[in-house]
Regions:
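Active-site "cap" helix and flanking loop/linker of ATP-utilizing ligase/carboxylase catalytic domains
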Residues: 160-181, 187, 197-245
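Peripheral (often C-terminal) accessory segments that flank ATP-dependent C-N-forming ligase machineries
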Residues: 221-283
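Protein kinase-like catalytic core scaffold
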Residues: 131, 191-195
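Short, conserved charged micro-motifs
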Residues: 63-66, 95-98, 247-252, 283
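Acidic/histidine-enriched active-site and ligand-binding environments that engage anionic O-linkages
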Residues: 66-75
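Internal nucleotide-binding/catalytic subdomain
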Residues: 86-181, 185-187
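Conserved N-proximal alpha/beta basic substrate-recognition cap immediately N-terminal to
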Residues: 1-63, 80-81
């Protein structure tokens, strides 16, 4: 083993730090520690002049009432939680769920009037050396990514801003490998950084078929110190996540030459579990 990498951010920092004493871990363990906590992640973004929704650290019910200017908003656990887990909608200070466990720390984020969600995937190979994929447009259902498409239907201003912010993030983190920045666009065409994923990302799975170099190959090239290949889009593409029982129809389907089915071969089908994905390219 020459280098260690990972594709799941909820790995305890102590484990990554210990591994890093044996062989280099990329992305660096300190980056993952920063991003694992939604509050420190938001602070990092704001310190770098990257707009986020308004937010506050919440330790108890009184903190929610003090921050009533953030309501309506979304209460999220500061750590863990994935695909909408550990999240609570707060509409009124009098309507706080009894399911909230205040032995944990939370972040309360004010809702924006959402028009669209996009993501930008970037691979950093070292100081100011990048390969950047154009923004991908995403649609979530029940807080789980359902559809992605490239190109995103967005203004040139938003495209440039989203790409620029992703570059700043990768550079300020001294990141090596592929990362994704997820964004909100509001009804006034303002861009907000929602979160950073320090890994290859679900929305970027379509790059396997849409580009000459996928997000996965670029990640491996970066962490292994291999040659950087100029990344080009070959086809526009749309991707559908296959969640739960959706996978069963696709396992028996016949596909056209511009359709690609990926079965993750998970042993158990469960509700809200990502079982595979399906990509269509526009030839």
């Amino acid at each position: 083993v020459n280098v260690i990498t990972y594709e799941f951010e909820n790995i305890p920092y102590k484990i990554l730090k210990k591994l890093n004493e044996i062989k280099p871990v990329l992305p660096k363990p300190e980056i993952n520690k920063l991003i694992q906590n939604r509050y420190t992640e938001k602070d990092f973004l704001n310190k770098n002049n990257i707009r986020t929704t308004r937010y506050s650290l919440i330790k108890d019910e009184d903190d929610i009432k003090i921050n009533d200017g953030l309501i309506p908003g979304l209460l999220k656990t500061c750590t863990l939680g994935y695909d909408g887990k550990g999240q609570f909608k707060i509409d009124k200070t009098e309507n706080i769920s009894s399911e909230i466990d205040f032995t944990k720390e939370y972040i309360l984020e004010k809702f924006v009037k959402l028009k669209k969600e996009i993501s930008v995937i970037i691979t950093r190979f070292g100081h100011q050396r990048y390969e950047i994929y154009e923004p991908i447009e995403n649609l979530h259902e029940d807080q789980i990514l359902k559809h992605s498409k490239i190109p995103a239907q967005i203004s040139e201003k938003i495209k440039n801003q989203a790409t620029n912010w992703a570059t700043i993030i990768a550079e300020e983190l001294d990141y090596v490998g592929t990362l994704c920045v997820e964004y909100f666009i509001d009804n006034k065409d303002n861009l907000y950084a929602n979160e950073i994923a320090p890994r290859v990302h679900n929305s970027g799975h379509l790059t396997i078929n849409s580009h000459n170099v996928s997000q996965f190959e670029n990640h491996i090239r970066a962490v292994c110190g291999l040659e950087k290949v100029e990344t080009k889009k070959i086809y526009n593409a749309r991707m559908l996540n296959l969640i739960g029982n959706d996978i069963e129809d696709y396992r028996v389907k016949n596909f056209k030459d511009n359709e690609f089915f990926f079965d993750y071969q998970k042993t158990e089908i469960r509700e809200k579990r990502k079982m595979g994905h399906f990509t269509i390219i526009e030839k």
